[in-house]
């Protein structure tokens, strides 16, 4: 299977070569990689330009000025990379972050899963970060069964079936739900992990509750489901005020949704606590 790898990059001079070198050393080499330099003001562009001179499977696309925003912007940058190729030439589409170091057998293992199960729509390993002791530990932001945003891969047929990625906050959860909606399996390889050099969304921790409200809106939750989801998060984080911040953010949203009514219905059903109980009967 042939892989297309898109790497959005914004001011990644400290990590970009570590990422690219780890891909250049993959045991599975049937891939092309496009680095999309999203208006970097550091040495990212120069570093990648020098790298691609010696690595013909890699190419660079430069964009002009950028604004840094979680979620929506990275998807828009990703699509700039897709425009550079004909997807007819590829079987698997990947969106990788520029601050990831991949083990040499990463793509080989991903390819094996796709080949063995035609209904597998998304595959990844796990994401590890370095703790204060210098140890590499699991980045415990989500379930180990979730294909994380920094290391997304999609079977092309699945990518088309779910109409691609949505350029909104929460895109990296929406894609999983839409893959499930289209009857594709989601696989994570538990003994295959990558090194994440910079913890996810580290710049946005202070805005977590506000972003959660925006996310609930983006996935089409109605008011009762948003309240239940906000309450669960608030209880988990032991923060009474978080509930009100999240709901205020949810109620303030008014932009058009990027989901169809059919997709919204599926997601609401998926997240409905009562429906989950009924499904277990």
Where on the chain are the PLM-derived regions?
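Short beta-strand-to-loop acidic/aromatic patch adjacent to the donor-nucleotide binding site
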Residues: 89-101
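Short, acidic, metal-binding catalytic loop of nucleotide-sugar glycosyltransferases
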Residues: 21-30
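Conserved donor NDP-sugar-binding/catalytic core segment of glycosyltransferases
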Residues: 101-137
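Conserved donor nucleotide-binding strand/loop of the catalytic core
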Residues: 46-88
């Amino acid at each position: 299977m042939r892989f297309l790898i898109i790497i959005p990059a914004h001011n990644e001079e400290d990590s970009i070569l570590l990422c690219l070198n780890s891909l250049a050393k993959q045991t599975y080499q049937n891939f092309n990689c496009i680095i999309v330099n999203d208006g970097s003001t550091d040495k990212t562009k120069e570093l990648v330009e020098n790298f691609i001179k010696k690595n013909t499977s890699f190419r660079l696309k430069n964009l002009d000025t950028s604004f840094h925003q979680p979620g929506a912007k990275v998807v828009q940058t990703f699509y700039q990379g897709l425009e550079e190729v004909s997807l007819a030439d590829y079987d698997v589409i990947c969106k990788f972050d520029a601050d990831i170091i991949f083990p040499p057998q990463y793509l080989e293992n991903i390819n094996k899963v796709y080949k063995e199960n035609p209904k597998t729509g998304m595959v990844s390993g796990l994401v590890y970060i370095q703790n204060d002791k210098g140890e590499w530990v699991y980045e415990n932001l989500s379930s180990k069964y979730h294909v994380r945003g920094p290391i997304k891969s999609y079977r092309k047929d699945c990518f088309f079936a779910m109409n691609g990625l949505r350029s909104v906050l929460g895109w990296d959860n929406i894609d999983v739900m839409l893959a499930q909606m289209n009857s594709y399996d989601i696989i994570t390889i538990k003994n295959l992990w990558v090194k994440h050099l910079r913890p996810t969304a580290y710049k946005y921790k202070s805005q977590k509750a506000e972003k959660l409200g925006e996310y609930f809106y983006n996935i089409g939750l109605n008011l009762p489901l948003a309240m239940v989801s906000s309450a669960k998060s608030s209880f988990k984080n032991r923060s009474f005020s978080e509930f009100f911040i999240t709901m205020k953010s949810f109620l303030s949203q008014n932009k058009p949704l990027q989901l169809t009514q059919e997709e919204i219905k599926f997601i609401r059903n998926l997240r409905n606590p009562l429906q989950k109980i009924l499904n277990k009967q």
